[in-house]
Amino acid sequence: MSNFINIHVLISHSPSCLNRDDMNMQKDAIFGGKRRVRISSQSLKRAMRKSGYYAQNIGESSLRTIHLAQLRDVLRQKLGERFDQKIIDKTLALLSGKSVDEAEKISADAVTPWVVGEIAWFCEQVAKAEADNLDDKKLLKVLKEDIAAIRVNLQQGVDIALSGRMATSGMMTELGKVDGAMSIAHAITTHQVDSDIDWFTAVDDLQEQGSAHLGTQEFSSGVFYRYANINLAQLQENLGGASREQALEIATHVVHMLATEVPGAKQRTYAAFNPADMVMVNFSDMPLSMANAFEKAVKAKDGFLQPSIQAFNQYWDRVANGYGLNGAAAQFSLSDVDPITAQVKQMPTLEQLKSWVRNNGEA
């Protein structure tokens, strides 16, 4: 049974500036000797986990912060009815390796994702340890013997199970590290891009000349290739031994978000809220990106979208034949481009593609 789900998306963005660097310019990359506009994987992942769809279908995302004092206050508010304040503070101190007192500024060593439900479970263990007169070392030993019990709590923090978690201090270094089950590539345009510059003014209505500020902003449009894969076995392990069905359900939602969610940068100015034009999912025994379909930059032919889908389909056929791919595969497309090889099921709607993923690649 195939362990990896590969998700391929082609999405055409109208003029926009969805991801910028430290110089306030569009992020880019050289691929195939040509400049491509780029949207970082970090930007895509944040857009997904902060989306309304994520909240409605997966649940509350983790709290990512370096500011432990603020986290302490949030935990006191959310868990105060269940646990004594001293237990909450001690639990956070043990997990972070930092003294959590009444100081206003307490910083962790790095930005870390925290799950309220997971911390509540740790509070229960700390309270029980105090009742049993266990010191911190004995408590750590007891907890290390059943990591799976800890991982079950990540069902309330699926984004950590997907993207992973690094810990550099406290008990989290031994109990909280998670190898992410999902990999997301930086999205790049399928074609070369020469950006434009928007010259803009901020108008002062009370001044005769009108202008209060002059500025410039780089922007462009383009067809982007997005790619992600999910290691189903790793996801099951990260969720404390979840079933394959549970992992497939989460993968289904990732497919939806990768096809529909867009980073929010400059969106009040450009409103590039474009849905995906093509989504393909395939099951395989290894991660499999189709980015090399665009190593030779696509040339415009009545736009870039149609030739990009054609380039993808043709490259997929070559890879599938050359490597003998026989895992289930399905594609949803808004385009009238000739369909991909017959071995790839054609889905009329995104919802039908999601149902196919949910059913383990079966109609």
Curated annotation (Swiss-Prot):
InterPro entries: CRISPR-assoc_prot_CT1975. GO terms for cellular component: protein-containing complex. It comes from the Bacteria. Disulfide bonds: none annotated. Keywords: Antiviral defense, RNA-binding. GO terms for biological process: CRISPR-cas system; defense response to virus. GO terms for molecular function: DNA/RNA hybrid binding; RNA binding. Pfam families: Cas_CT1975. Disruption phenotype: Loss of resistance to bacteriophage lambda infection, loss of plasmid silencing. Increased levels of 57 nucleotide crRNA and also 2 and 3 spacer-repeat units. Induction: Repressed by H-NS, activated by LeuO. Activated by the BaeSR two-component regulatory system, possibly due to envelope stress. Part of the casABCDE-ygbT-ygbF operon. CRISPR (clustered regularly interspaced short palindromic repeat), is an adaptive immune system that provides protection against mobile genetic elements (viruses, transposable elements and conjugative plasmids). CRISPR clusters contain sequences complementary to antecedent mobile elements and target invading nucleic acids. CRISPR clusters are transcribed and processed into CRISPR RNA (crRNA). A component of Cascade, which participates in CRISPR interference, the third stage of CRISPR immunity. Cascade binds both crRNA and in a sequence-specific manner negatively supercoiled dsDNA target. This leads to the formation of an R-loop in which the crRNA binds the target DNA, displacing the noncomplementary strand. Cas3 is recruited to Cascade, nicks target DNA and then unwinds and cleaves the target, leading to DNA degradation and invader neutralization. CasCDE alone is also able to form R-loops. Part of the Cascade ribonucleoprotein complex, with stoichiometry CasA(1),CasB(2),CasC(6),CasD(1),CasE(1)-crRNA(1). The 6 CasC subunits make a helical stack forming a groove in which the crRNA lies. Interacts directly with all of the Cas subunits. Stable subcomplexes of CasBCDE-crRNA and CasCDE-crRNA also form, both of which are able to bind target dsDNA, and at least CasCDE is able to form R-loops. CasCDE and CasCE complexes have endonuclease activity. Interacts with YgbT (Cas1). Binding of target ssRNA or dsDNA causes a conformational change in the Cascade complex. NCBIfam families: casC_Cse4. This is CRISPR system Cascade subunit CasC. The lineage of its organism: Bacteria, Pseudomonadati, Pseudomonadota, Gammaproteobacteria, Enterobacterales.
